[in-house]
């Protein structure tokens, strides 16, 4: 296995393709970037200089791709040397561009395969073909602004500057979606129509009945909170629905093409399931709100609700209509198409195969797959030189960013074959971890390591190699994948699914103290349902009957509160699964594990995962409080007539308390400075480094211990054409693996599009225009 690394971090300076303002100087570009097909292609697409300002979230870049467009738009690209000649089937772009009726194109796949560049380049090409185009990012860790070299955040379509192309960009604002939910749910009504007066009515009524002690048990329930807690993932579902709302409005009717840059696979699968979940959840809340209209003021007072629920119901029903619109849109073959994006590796192809199965199961239209980053036969030493030059800017960002500067820096080489299996991981780990291993190994007897970062930067390879390194050192080690789109089994070439630790075997016969575990979200979800099991509300209804409140009990039973508790929201499964890992590590049979390495999902997913214990702590806390208070109220009523005999303990309360305790353990583990370390994995590109800067800031804000950053896939100075020859052979094996995935639902049934590995980062409209002309033929 040959290596391609060599630049010491931050050692190379100067020689950029941009001036101090971030604008590209064509004369300097042609001199400094001579020999780069991408740079030459950009120059061919450039006209006069423009005054477009650099994207405010990024420093001036060395990439030719950040060059602004001329004011009058790009001239047709001249013939330039191509990095590869894809053997794409003809008519791909013609089909995507045909007709003026609106089409939605969603590009999804494994993290780091270039979805943003592919989406943005397709949007640029569609706009150049005359379509009024909107490119939308639904990834919680946005990269679209970085790719377009213009800020398109804020939750509203932004017209791209410096070009006359009819092209808009939009990064979805999840906070806006949450605000809309709170408005619709009636949060904050307590102090308005009927709030305090309704609550006082409840107290007066109970006191008149001589049952003031019951209201003491009930008044802390805050039942209204059950209506006002948005589930995890609602933000994305509502946000996509909001895009549909945008394009239905008269002012946005002009969009004939909408391209979605989606989050990595696991997140996208969740996104596709969200409309069903949100639709069902909203239906329950709407039904509850409607029934509250006919309830007595006493019952309404328990929810802090005013006399009329009409306005809240109207808002929630509008929200529900939009969510249903998205649900239908995903499955409409005449309007929507999913394109799977992957790279020529076994891990990438296997994940794409699983994604296609999921899309088929959900009846999502998908007929194309694009294999990106293919090393072409014309790429040689000149390509490697350009790649080394282009990575300088990113390495300098890592060295100089205030959030990343204090971290230990690990430079991991780009290798010429895919790192799979224990021997390859052992070799890779010896190269990567040798300089920091002793420091990381110091301290606590048992340590946790979480590796995270942008999709496709090599988190699974890095985490697996670290686990093998610990095991080679004699430390009993468990490596855990929390990514819904698992790659851990592929990395070890061994099935690690099932939700329990599996002993990892080496083909060399070595007896390593190493186990692997892919968290099983479905199993975790089933366990959560068991914890929340309420027999359709039967247990709750029995409790309400026990209160002996007559019509009030009847009305509360009619509200079917149990239904609000029986649907675990998306995202909860992972948090429960992680809590389960933390829990079973406390058990005596797992006490021998000294090192636990987490291979986490891509950035946006990981940030949500780290905040989920807080969400669950709050939501599970409400459920525990609800059960406890109702049980206590029932006991109080029973004691009144039974002479003070203690009431039976609610089994569900015990289960919920245990779950809450494990959540607390997980939350504490994430933040323990002595036992836990988060390691950011990135690659030497400006876009990936910019995302790493944002991730570091978010982790530090959450109080997560962060000490190390790995810059992976660094091309070394001693890399030669032999390195690329080996890469091409390895990629050919992966492409053959794709072609062998036959059958009606296999990858071989899809139209194959091939896209080149570029020697410079694809950023800015000119580079996207050139890249799009190469790919979308």
Swiss-Prot record:
Active site, UniProt feature: 139, 483
Keywords from the named record: ATP-binding, Cytoplasm, Hydrolase, Nucleotide-binding, Transport
Enzyme Commission code: 3.6.-.-
Main location: cytoplasm
Phenotype when the gene is knocked out: Small chloroplast and strong decrease in chlorophyll content. Defect in the accumulation of photosystem protein complexes. Defect in the accumulation of TOC34, an essential component of the outer chloroplast membrane translocon (TOC) complex, which, in turn, catalyzes the import of nucleus-encoded precursor polypeptides into the chloroplast.
Similarity section: Belongs to the arsA ATPase family.
PANTHER family on file: ARSENICAL PUMP-DRIVING ATPASE ARSENITE-TRANSLOCATING ATPASE (PTHR10803), ATPASE GET3B (PTHR10803:SF0)
The name this protein goes by in its record: ATPase ARSA1
Species this protein is from: Chlamydomonas reinhardtii
Gene assigned in the entry: ARSA1
């Amino acid at each position: 296995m040959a290596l391609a690394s060599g630049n010491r971090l931050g050692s190379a300076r100067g020689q950029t393709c941009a001036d101090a303002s971030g604008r590209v100087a064509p004369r300097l570009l042609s001199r400094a970037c001579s020999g780069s097909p991408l740079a030459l292609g950009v120059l061919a697409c450039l006209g006069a200089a423009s005054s477009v300002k650099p994207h405010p979230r990024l420093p001036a870049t060395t990439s030719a791709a950040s060059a602004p467009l001329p004011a009058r738009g790009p001239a047709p690209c001249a013939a330039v040397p191509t990095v590869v000649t894809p053997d794409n089937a003809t008519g791909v772009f013609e089909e995507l561009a045909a007709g003026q009726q609106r089409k939605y194109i969603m590009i999804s796949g494994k993290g780091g395969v270039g979805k943003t560049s592919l989406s943005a380049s397709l949007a640029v090409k569609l706009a150049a073909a005359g379509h009024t185009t909107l490119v939308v990012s639904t990834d919680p860790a946005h990269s679209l602004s970085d790719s377009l070299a213009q800020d398109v955040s804020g939750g509203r379509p932004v017209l791209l500057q410096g070009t006359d192309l009819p092209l808009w960009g939009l990064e979805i604002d999840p906070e806006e979606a949450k605000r809309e939910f709170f408005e619709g749910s009636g949060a904050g009504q307590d102090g308005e129509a009927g709030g305090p007066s309704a609550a006082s009515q409840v107290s007066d009524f109970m006191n008149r009945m001589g049952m003031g002690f019951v209201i003491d048990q009930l008044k802390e329930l805050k039942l209204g909170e059950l209506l006002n807690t948005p589930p995890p993932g609602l933000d994305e579902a509502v946000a996509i629905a909001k895009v549909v709302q945008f394009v239905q409005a008269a002012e946005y009717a002009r969009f004939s093409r909408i391209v979605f840059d989606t989050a990595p696979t696991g997140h996208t699968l969740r996104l596709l399931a969200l409309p069903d979940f949100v639709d069902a959840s909203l239906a329950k809340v709407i039904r509850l709100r409607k029934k509250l209209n006919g309830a007595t003021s006493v019952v309404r007072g328990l929810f802090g609700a005013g006399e009329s629920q009409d306005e809240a119901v109207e808002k929630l029903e509008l929200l529900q209509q939009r969510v249903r619109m998205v649900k239908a849109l995903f499955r409409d073959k005449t309007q929507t198409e999913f394109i799977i994006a992957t790279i020529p590796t076994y891990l990438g192809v296997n994940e794409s195969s699983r994604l296609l199965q999921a899309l088929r199961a959900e009846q999502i239209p998908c007929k194309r797959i694009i294999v990106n980053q293919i090393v072409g036969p014309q790429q040689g030493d000149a390509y490697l030189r350009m790649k080394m030059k282009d990575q300088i800017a990113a390495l300098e960002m890592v060295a100089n960013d205030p959030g990343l500067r204090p971290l230990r820096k690990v430079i991991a080489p780009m290798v010429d074959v895919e790192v799979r299996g224990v021997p390859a991981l052992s070799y890779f780990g010896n190269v990567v971890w040798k300089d920091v291993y002793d420091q990381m190994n110091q301290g606590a007897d048992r340590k946790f390591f979480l590796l995270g970062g942008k999709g496709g930067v090599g988190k699974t390879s890095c985490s697996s190699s670290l686990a093998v390194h610990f095991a080679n050192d004699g430390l009993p080690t468990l490596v855990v994948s929390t990514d819904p789109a698992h790659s851990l089994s592929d990395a070890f070439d061994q099935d690690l699914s099932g939700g329990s630790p599996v002993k990892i075997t080496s083909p060399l016969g070595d007896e390593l103290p190493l186990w692997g575990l892919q968290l099983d979200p479905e199993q975790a979800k089933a366990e959560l349902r068991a914890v929340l099991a309420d027999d359709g509300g039967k247990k709750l209804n029995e409790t309400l009957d026990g209160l002996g409140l007559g019509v009030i009990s009847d009305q509360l039973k009619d509200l079917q509160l149990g239904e609000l508790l029986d649907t675990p929201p998306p995202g909860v499964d992972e948090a429960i699964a992680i809590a389960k890992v933390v829990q079973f590590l406390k058990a005596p049979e797992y006490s021998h594990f000294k090192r636990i390495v987490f291979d986490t999902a891509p950035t946006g997913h990981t940030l949500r995962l780290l905040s989920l214990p807080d969400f669950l702590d709050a939501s599970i806390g409400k459920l525990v409080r609800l059960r406890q208070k109702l049980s206590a109220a029932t006991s109080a009523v029973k004691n009144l007539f039974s002479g003070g005999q203690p009431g039976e303990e609610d089994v569900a309360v015990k289960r919920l308390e245990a779950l809450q305790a494990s959540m607390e353990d997980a939350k504490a583990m994430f933040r323990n400075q002595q036992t836990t370390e988060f390691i950011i994995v990135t690659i030497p590109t400006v876009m990936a480094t910019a995302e790493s800067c944002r991730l570091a800031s978010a982790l530090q804000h959450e109080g997560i211990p962060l000490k190390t950053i790995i810059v992976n896939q660094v091309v070394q100075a001693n890399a030669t054409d032999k390195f690329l020859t080996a890469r091409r052979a390895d990629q050919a094996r992966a492409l053959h693996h794709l072609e062998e995935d036959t059958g009606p639902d296999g990858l071989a049934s899809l139209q194959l599009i091939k896209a080149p590995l570029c020697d410079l980062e694809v950023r800015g409209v000119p580079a996207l225009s050139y890249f799009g002309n190469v790919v979308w033929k």
